Curated annotation (Swiss-Prot):
GO terms for biological process: 'de novo' pyrimidine nucleobase biosynthetic process; 'de novo' UMP biosynthetic process; amino acid metabolic process. Keywords: Pyrimidine biosynthesis, Transferase. InterPro entries: Asp/Orn_carbamoyltranf_P-bd (IPR006132), Asp/Orn_carbamoylTrfase (IPR006130), Asp/Orn_carbamoylTrfase_sf (IPR036901), Asp_carbamoyltransf (IPR002082), Asp_carbamoyltransf_Asp/Orn-bd (IPR006131). Heterododecamer (2C3:3R2) of six catalytic PyrB chains organized as two trimers (C3), and six regulatory PyrI chains organized as three dimers (R2). Gene3D superfamilies: Aspartate/ornithine carbamoyltransferase. It comes from Acaryochloris marina (strain MBIC 11017). Pfam families: OTCace (PF00185), OTCace_N (PF02729). Carbamoyl phosphate binds at residues 61-62, 111, 144, 147, 279-280. Catalyzes the condensation of carbamoyl phosphate and aspartate to form carbamoyl aspartate and inorganic phosphate, the committed step in the de novo pyrimidine nucleotide biosynthesis pathway. Its EC number is 2.1.3.2. Pathway: Pyrimidine metabolism; UMP biosynthesis via de novo pathway; (S)-dihydroorotate from bicarbonate: step 2/3. It is an enzyme of class 2 (transferase). One of its GO terms (cellular component) is cytosol. This is Aspartate carbamoyltransferase catalytic subunit.
Amino acid sequence: MAETTWNRHHVLSLADFSADELNIVLQTANSFKDVLYRKTKKVPTLQARLVTNLFFEPSTRTRSSFELAAKRLSADVLNFSPGTSSLSKGETILDTAKTFLAMGADMMVIRHQHSGVPQMIAQAMDDLGEQVGVLNAGDGFHEHPSQGLLDLFTLCTTLDPDQPTTHLLTGKKIAIVGDILHSRVARSNLSSLVTCGADVHLAGPPTLLPKEFADYGAQVHWSLEPALEQADFVMTLRLQHERMSQHLIPSIREYHQQFGITRDRIQRCQPQVKVLHPGPVNRGVEISSDLMDDESLSLIPHQVTSGIAVRMALLYLISNRSR
Protein backbone atom coordinates (compact mmCIF):
# COMPACT_ATOMS: atom_id res chain seq x y z
CA MET A 1 0.00 0.00 0.00
CA ALA A 2 1.11 3.56 -0.73
CA GLU A 3 1.12 5.20 2.67
CA THR A 4 4.76 6.18 3.21
CA THR A 5 4.23 9.89 2.54
CA TRP A 6 0.68 10.18 3.89
CA ASN A 7 0.65 12.54 6.87
CA ARG A 8 -3.00 13.55 7.13
CA HIS A 9 -4.89 12.74 10.28
CA HIS A 10 -8.16 14.12 8.87
CA VAL A 11 -9.64 14.59 5.39
CA LEU A 12 -11.72 17.76 5.56
CA SER A 13 -11.06 19.49 2.24
CA LEU A 14 -9.24 18.94 -1.04
CA ALA A 15 -8.21 22.58 -1.32
CA ASP A 16 -4.73 21.93 0.06
CA PHE A 17 -4.15 18.44 -1.35
CA SER A 18 -0.99 18.10 -3.42
CA ALA A 19 -0.80 16.00 -6.57
CA ASP A 20 1.35 13.51 -4.65
CA GLU A 21 -1.35 13.10 -2.01
CA LEU A 22 -4.01 12.64 -4.67
CA ASN A 23 -1.85 9.96 -6.25
CA ILE A 24 -1.53 8.13 -2.94
CA VAL A 25 -5.32 7.95 -2.70
CA LEU A 26 -5.61 6.81 -6.32
CA GLN A 27 -2.99 4.08 -5.92
CA THR A 28 -4.42 2.85 -2.63
CA ALA A 29 -7.97 2.82 -4.01
CA ASN A 30 -6.78 0.89 -7.05
CA SER A 31 -5.29 -1.79 -4.83
CA PHE A 32 -8.57 -2.11 -2.91
CA LYS A 33 -10.66 -2.14 -6.09
CA ASP A 34 -9.71 -5.76 -6.72
CA VAL A 35 -11.27 -6.75 -3.37
CA LEU A 36 -14.68 -5.65 -4.65
CA TYR A 37 -14.60 -8.21 -7.45
CA ARG A 38 -13.39 -11.19 -5.43
CA LYS A 39 -15.63 -13.96 -4.19
CA THR A 40 -14.72 -13.02 -0.61
CA LYS A 41 -15.13 -9.24 -0.64
CA LYS A 42 -13.40 -8.53 2.65
CA VAL A 43 -9.91 -7.98 4.05
CA PRO A 44 -8.89 -7.82 7.75
CA THR A 45 -7.15 -4.44 7.42
CA LEU A 46 -9.27 -2.56 10.00
CA GLN A 47 -10.30 -5.47 12.17
CA ALA A 48 -11.22 -4.30 15.71
CA ARG A 49 -11.32 -0.64 14.61
CA LEU A 50 -14.52 1.35 15.15
CA VAL A 51 -15.86 3.66 12.44
CA THR A 52 -18.76 5.93 13.40
CA ASN A 53 -20.94 7.48 10.71
CA LEU A 54 -22.31 10.73 12.15
CA PHE A 55 -24.76 11.88 9.50
CA PHE A 56 -26.67 14.92 10.74
CA GLU A 57 -28.08 15.35 7.22
CA PRO A 58 -30.01 12.69 5.25
CA SER A 59 -27.91 10.52 2.98
CA THR A 60 -28.32 7.21 1.22
CA ARG A 61 -25.40 6.86 -1.18
CA THR A 62 -22.60 8.37 0.87
CA ARG A 63 -23.50 6.74 4.17
CA SER A 64 -24.07 3.34 2.57
CA SER A 65 -20.79 3.65 0.68
CA PHE A 66 -18.79 4.54 3.81
CA GLU A 67 -20.50 1.78 5.77
CA LEU A 68 -19.77 -0.81 3.10
CA ALA A 69 -16.17 0.42 2.74
CA ALA A 70 -15.61 0.04 6.48
CA LYS A 71 -17.16 -3.43 6.53
CA ARG A 72 -15.08 -4.53 3.53
CA LEU A 73 -12.07 -3.63 5.70
CA SER A 74 -13.53 -5.66 8.62
CA ALA A 75 -14.12 -2.59 10.80
CA ASP A 76 -16.96 -2.32 13.29
CA VAL A 77 -19.49 0.34 12.26
CA LEU A 78 -21.88 2.51 14.27
CA ASN A 79 -24.45 4.61 12.41
CA PHE A 80 -25.92 7.76 13.92
CA SER A 81 -29.33 9.19 13.03
CA PRO A 82 -30.25 12.61 14.47
CA GLY A 83 -33.97 11.88 14.46
CA THR A 84 -33.59 9.21 17.13
CA SER A 85 -30.67 10.76 19.01
CA SER A 86 -30.23 12.91 22.10
CA LEU A 87 -29.86 15.95 19.81
CA SER A 88 -33.65 16.12 19.89
CA LYS A 89 -33.33 16.41 23.68
CA GLY A 90 -30.89 19.31 23.58
CA GLU A 91 -27.51 17.58 23.35
CA THR A 92 -24.89 19.51 21.37
CA ILE A 93 -23.18 18.15 18.28
CA LEU A 94 -19.83 18.15 20.05
CA ASP A 95 -21.24 16.25 23.02
CA THR A 96 -22.64 13.68 20.59
CA ALA A 97 -19.18 13.27 19.07
CA LYS A 98 -17.64 12.94 22.53
CA THR A 99 -20.16 10.21 23.35
CA PHE A 100 -18.95 8.15 20.40
CA LEU A 101 -15.38 8.95 21.40
CA ALA A 102 -16.09 7.44 24.81
CA MET A 103 -17.38 4.33 23.04
CA GLY A 104 -13.96 3.91 21.46
CA ALA A 105 -14.39 5.47 18.03
CA ASP A 106 -11.21 5.37 15.95
CA MET A 107 -12.64 7.32 13.02
CA MET A 108 -15.62 9.62 12.58
CA VAL A 109 -17.29 10.17 9.22
CA ILE A 110 -19.31 13.37 9.49
CA ARG A 111 -21.97 14.96 7.28
CA HIS A 112 -23.78 18.13 8.27
CA GLN A 113 -25.97 20.72 6.57
CA HIS A 114 -23.79 23.54 7.88
CA SER A 115 -20.30 24.26 6.61
CA GLY A 116 -17.47 23.79 9.09
CA VAL A 117 -18.96 21.18 11.43
CA PRO A 118 -16.49 18.40 10.52
CA GLN A 119 -13.62 20.86 10.96
CA MET A 120 -14.98 21.90 14.35
CA ILE A 121 -15.18 18.30 15.56
CA ALA A 122 -11.72 17.49 14.18
CA GLN A 123 -10.26 20.49 16.01
CA ALA A 124 -12.02 19.45 19.21
CA MET A 125 -10.57 15.94 18.97
CA ASP A 126 -7.11 17.39 18.41
CA ASP A 127 -7.50 19.77 21.36
CA LEU A 128 -8.44 16.81 23.55
CA GLY A 129 -5.31 15.00 22.42
CA GLU A 130 -7.38 12.21 20.88
CA GLN A 131 -5.99 10.38 17.87
CA VAL A 132 -9.35 10.12 16.13
CA GLY A 133 -9.44 10.60 12.37
CA VAL A 134 -12.27 12.74 10.98
CA LEU A 135 -13.53 12.49 7.40
CA ASN A 136 -15.80 15.14 5.95
CA ALA A 137 -18.71 13.41 4.19
CA GLY A 138 -20.17 16.73 3.04
CA ASP A 139 -20.73 19.98 4.92
CA GLY A 140 -23.12 22.65 3.69
CA PHE A 141 -21.87 24.43 0.59
CA HIS A 142 -18.25 23.83 1.60
CA GLU A 143 -16.88 20.52 0.31
CA HIS A 144 -17.44 16.82 -0.24
CA PRO A 145 -13.87 15.46 -0.41
CA SER A 146 -14.61 11.76 -0.82
CA GLN A 147 -16.94 12.51 -3.75
CA GLY A 148 -14.24 14.63 -5.36
CA LEU A 149 -11.73 11.81 -4.91
CA LEU A 150 -14.05 9.11 -6.25
CA ASP A 151 -14.79 11.26 -9.29
CA LEU A 152 -11.06 11.71 -9.79
CA PHE A 153 -10.54 7.95 -9.46
CA THR A 154 -13.34 7.30 -11.97
CA LEU A 155 -11.79 9.68 -14.50
CA CYS A 156 -8.28 8.28 -14.11
CA THR A 157 -9.29 4.61 -14.22
CA THR A 158 -11.29 5.34 -17.36
CA LEU A 159 -8.11 6.62 -18.98
CA ASP A 160 -5.86 3.90 -17.53
CA PRO A 161 -7.46 1.12 -15.46
CA ASP A 162 -4.12 -0.29 -14.32
CA GLN A 163 -2.18 2.85 -13.42
CA PRO A 164 -4.56 5.69 -12.49
CA THR A 165 -2.47 8.79 -11.80
CA THR A 166 -3.10 12.52 -11.82
CA HIS A 167 -0.93 13.20 -14.87
CA LEU A 168 -3.52 11.44 -17.03
CA LEU A 169 -5.80 14.48 -16.61
CA THR A 170 -3.21 17.09 -17.53
CA GLY A 171 -4.68 19.13 -20.38
CA LYS A 172 -7.94 17.18 -20.47
CA LYS A 173 -10.99 19.40 -20.88
CA ILE A 174 -13.59 18.71 -18.21
CA ALA A 175 -16.95 20.49 -18.22
CA ILE A 176 -18.88 20.78 -14.95
CA VAL A 177 -22.47 21.83 -15.61
CA GLY A 178 -25.33 22.88 -13.38
CA ASP A 179 -25.94 24.24 -9.91
CA ILE A 180 -22.36 25.18 -9.05
CA LEU A 181 -23.39 27.73 -6.41
CA HIS A 182 -24.91 25.20 -4.02
CA SER A 183 -22.63 22.28 -4.88
CA ARG A 184 -20.01 21.12 -2.38
CA VAL A 185 -19.15 18.43 -4.94
CA ALA A 186 -18.20 21.09 -7.49
CA ARG A 187 -15.87 22.80 -5.03
CA SER A 188 -14.05 19.57 -4.19
CA ASN A 189 -13.81 18.61 -7.85
CA LEU A 190 -12.51 22.03 -8.81
CA SER A 191 -9.71 21.79 -6.26
CA SER A 192 -8.58 18.32 -7.28
CA LEU A 193 -8.95 18.76 -11.04
CA VAL A 194 -7.06 22.05 -11.14
CA THR A 195 -4.29 20.45 -9.06
CA CYS A 196 -4.11 17.69 -11.68
CA GLY A 197 -3.65 20.24 -14.46
CA ALA A 198 -7.04 19.66 -16.08
CA ASP A 199 -8.68 22.35 -18.21
CA VAL A 200 -11.85 22.91 -16.18
CA HIS A 201 -14.88 24.69 -17.64
CA LEU A 202 -17.97 25.57 -15.59
CA ALA A 203 -21.37 26.15 -17.16
CA GLY A 204 -24.64 27.24 -15.62
CA PRO A 205 -27.06 30.15 -15.39
CA PRO A 206 -25.57 33.29 -13.76
CA THR A 207 -27.83 32.81 -10.72
CA LEU A 208 -26.20 29.42 -10.06
CA LEU A 209 -22.67 30.22 -11.24
CA PRO A 210 -21.13 33.41 -9.83
CA LYS A 211 -18.17 34.73 -11.81
CA GLU A 212 -16.03 34.43 -8.66
CA PHE A 213 -15.67 30.72 -9.39
CA ALA A 214 -13.05 31.72 -11.94
CA ASP A 215 -10.81 32.33 -8.91
CA TYR A 216 -10.62 28.54 -8.51
CA GLY A 217 -8.71 28.33 -11.78
CA ALA A 218 -11.64 27.38 -14.02
CA GLN A 219 -13.26 29.10 -16.98
CA VAL A 220 -16.83 30.27 -16.36
CA HIS A 221 -19.55 30.10 -19.03
CA TRP A 222 -23.16 31.22 -18.74
CA SER A 223 -24.10 29.16 -21.77
CA LEU A 224 -23.53 25.47 -22.36
CA GLU A 225 -21.96 25.32 -25.81
CA PRO A 226 -18.44 26.69 -25.09
CA ALA A 227 -18.07 24.40 -22.09
CA LEU A 228 -18.96 21.31 -24.12
CA GLU A 229 -16.83 22.18 -27.15
CA GLN A 230 -14.23 19.36 -27.49
CA ALA A 231 -14.71 18.30 -23.86
CA ASP A 232 -13.20 14.96 -22.81
CA PHE A 233 -15.56 14.53 -19.85
CA VAL A 234 -18.84 16.16 -18.84
CA MET A 235 -19.93 16.20 -15.22
CA THR A 236 -23.46 17.39 -14.59
CA LEU A 237 -24.72 18.36 -11.14
CA ARG A 238 -28.11 18.04 -9.49
CA LEU A 239 -30.31 21.07 -9.01
CA GLN A 240 -30.25 21.38 -5.22
CA HIS A 241 -33.81 22.46 -4.50
CA GLU A 242 -33.39 21.89 -0.76
CA ARG A 243 -30.58 24.48 -0.62
CA MET A 244 -32.28 27.18 -2.67
CA SER A 245 -33.84 29.98 -0.65
CA GLN A 246 -35.01 31.86 -3.76
CA HIS A 247 -36.32 31.01 -7.21
CA LEU A 248 -33.01 31.06 -9.08
CA ILE A 249 -34.22 29.48 -12.33
CA PRO A 250 -37.38 30.30 -14.33
CA SER A 251 -38.52 26.66 -14.44
CA ILE A 252 -37.20 23.10 -14.50
CA ARG A 253 -38.23 22.81 -18.14
CA GLU A 254 -36.34 25.92 -19.17
CA TYR A 255 -33.28 24.81 -17.21
CA HIS A 256 -33.20 21.51 -19.10
CA GLN A 257 -33.63 23.31 -22.41
CA GLN A 258 -30.61 25.49 -21.69
CA PHE A 259 -28.30 23.28 -19.60
CA GLY A 260 -29.58 19.70 -19.72
CA ILE A 261 -27.05 17.21 -21.09
CA THR A 262 -28.48 15.26 -24.02
CA ARG A 263 -27.16 12.98 -26.72
CA ASP A 264 -27.44 15.76 -29.30
CA ARG A 265 -25.55 18.26 -27.17
CA ILE A 266 -22.56 16.03 -26.49
CA GLN A 267 -21.93 15.89 -30.23
CA ARG A 268 -19.86 19.01 -29.57
CA CYS A 269 -17.54 17.00 -27.32
CA GLN A 270 -14.68 14.68 -28.14
CA PRO A 271 -15.80 11.42 -29.81
CA GLN A 272 -14.75 9.39 -26.74
CA VAL A 273 -16.54 11.70 -24.26
CA LYS A 274 -17.92 10.23 -21.04
CA VAL A 275 -20.61 11.66 -18.77
CA LEU A 276 -20.66 11.70 -14.95
CA HIS A 277 -23.15 12.69 -12.25
CA PRO A 278 -22.62 12.46 -8.46
CA GLY A 279 -26.25 11.49 -7.84
CA PRO A 280 -29.02 11.48 -7.01
CA VAL A 281 -30.08 12.27 -10.56
CA ASN A 282 -33.15 14.21 -11.64
CA ARG A 283 -33.79 12.33 -14.89
CA GLY A 284 -34.77 14.59 -17.73
CA VAL A 285 -33.52 17.67 -15.89
CA GLU A 286 -29.72 17.57 -15.59
CA ILE A 287 -29.30 14.67 -18.01
CA SER A 288 -31.58 12.80 -20.39
CA SER A 289 -32.60 9.27 -19.40
CA ASP A 290 -31.31 7.66 -22.59
CA LEU A 291 -27.87 9.19 -22.07
CA MET A 292 -27.77 8.27 -18.40
CA ASP A 293 -28.55 4.63 -19.22
CA ASP A 294 -26.09 4.34 -22.12
CA GLU A 295 -23.22 2.24 -20.77
CA SER A 296 -20.93 3.37 -23.59
CA LEU A 297 -21.23 7.00 -22.49
CA SER A 298 -22.27 7.11 -18.83
CA LEU A 299 -19.79 6.55 -15.99
CA ILE A 300 -22.44 6.92 -13.28
CA PRO A 301 -22.44 3.23 -12.20
CA HIS A 302 -18.63 3.31 -12.16
CA GLN A 303 -18.73 6.30 -9.83
CA VAL A 304 -20.73 4.27 -7.31
CA THR A 305 -18.25 1.38 -7.40
CA SER A 306 -15.30 3.77 -7.30
CA GLY A 307 -16.77 5.34 -4.19
CA ILE A 308 -16.40 2.14 -2.19
CA ALA A 309 -12.76 1.66 -3.22
CA VAL A 310 -11.86 5.30 -2.56
CA ARG A 311 -13.53 5.32 0.85
CA MET A 312 -11.75 2.08 1.72
CA ALA A 313 -8.52 3.85 0.81
CA LEU A 314 -9.33 6.90 2.94
CA LEU A 315 -10.28 4.83 5.98
CA TYR A 316 -7.11 2.78 5.59
CA LEU A 317 -4.86 5.82 5.21
CA ILE A 318 -6.48 7.69 8.09
CA SER A 319 -6.34 4.60 10.30
CA ASN A 320 -2.55 4.59 10.10
CA ARG A 321 -2.57 8.03 11.69
CA SER A 322 -5.16 7.28 14.39
CA ARG A 323 -4.92 5.20 17.50
